Amino acid sequence: MGINEIIMYIMMFFMLIAAVDRILSQFGGSARFLGKFGKSIEGSGGQFEEGFMAMGALGLAMVGMTALAPVLAHVLGPVIIPVYEMLGANPSMFAGTLLACDMGGFFLAKELAGGDVAAWLYSGLILGSMMGPTIVFSIPVALGIIEPSDRRYLALGVLAGIVTIPIGCIAGGLVAMYSGVQINGQPVEFTFALILMNMIPVLIVAVLVALGLKFIPEKMINGFQIFAKFLVALITLGLAAAVVKFLLGWELIPGLDPIFMAPGDKPGEVMRAIEVIGSISCVLLGAYPMVLLLTRWFEKPLMSVGKVLNMNNIAAAGMVATLANNIPMFGMMKQMDTRGKGINCAFAVSAAFALGDHLGFAAANMNAMIFPMIVGKLIGGVTAIGVAMMLVPKEDASAAKTEAEAQS
């Protein structure tokens, strides 16, 4: 049994605990029947529900872009392919740079990869779980949640996180290379050359974004907002056209991928968008309760991390929440000290969703890549913390240290 299978078994263990809690909550609660242990698992049933309810949000984000992937590859290919080949990189890296893996990046990367499976997975699941989500999701969503006065720390954190994405990608690529990733029994050949050469365009984009956030942060952040709105419009167009094609047979946009199984698809080998979403939700049934219960059971060690980093307990809790979903963390930012704000935003760039949606997506689409993806995301997130700690202004760091000491 490999590490990827072990991770799945662990999540299914937590899924069963959460299912028990949901059942017992109908008859007075887990504590009533299971005593102290029941009290320790109460609330996991609610996370069980959250995992399944995520299906709707995932569908809105994924289905349209998944259907559009071959169309976008056909339209963008003549421009993207020559540029990336000139840089010595695979064109699939374009997809993971701008799109989250679960918002079309994985499928667009496959279309642009030209048959290079390693490059497709490197972009679609490793890069596409770090840079793409930051640009199309995290920044626009954060701007709608955080206080205007905290935009400074968002920009600082994203800057720190962006520059360490290549470190996380290389780490994930090396784990994939040495763990012997296979698809349908066939080995996927990750090489040093592939891992390093494909980082060239990523480094260029990372440097440009970092410079923009350093010198024109407001304009850069507004630019991300505009791009995100355009992307939502495009995804909605793709979803509407795909549904019309499925229900009425009208091909409003030629070349769309089917969103349900089509004639010739082999069950278990080919999964279309709707089935992928269902598979992700099944994984999230265990992933969300796992994060809740691990946070509860190991609260003291986790809070001690906050003291080591000289930030308050709210900031430490935000980092843990980020591993499942960064939206709660952004909601907590107003209660964090300034050092914690910068560190949390930096950590979220790579590490967000590592034990949530991205884990579910990898498990549903390519479970051999679960461990490489998680390692890459966590290393990218941890190194981003180090950079953020250097970027936090000295006066903010001193204030944070004083506040952390007062809480201890």
Q: At which residue positions do the language-model features occur?
A:
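Transmembrane alpha-helix boundary signature
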Residues: 70-75, 109-116, 174-179, 250
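Alpha-helical membrane segments and immediately flanking helix-loop junctions
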Residues: 87-167, 312-366
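Membrane-spanning helices that line or support transport/gating and their immediate boundary helices
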Residues: 71, 75-83, 293-308, 386, ...
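Short amphipathic alpha-helical coupling elements at transmembrane boundaries
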Residues: 43-54, 81-86, 229, 300-311
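Juxtamembrane "helix exit" motif at the C-terminal ends of alpha-helical transmembrane segments
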Residues: 68-77, 170, 245, 353-368, ...
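Interfacial/capping segments of alpha-helical transmembrane domains
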Residues: 71-90, 251-260
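Signature of multi-pass transmembrane helix bundles
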Residues: 1-64, 123-128, 135-286, 367-408
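Intrinsically disordered, low-complexity segments enriched in Gly and acidic/Ser/Thr residues
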Residues: 287-288, 301-307, 314-319
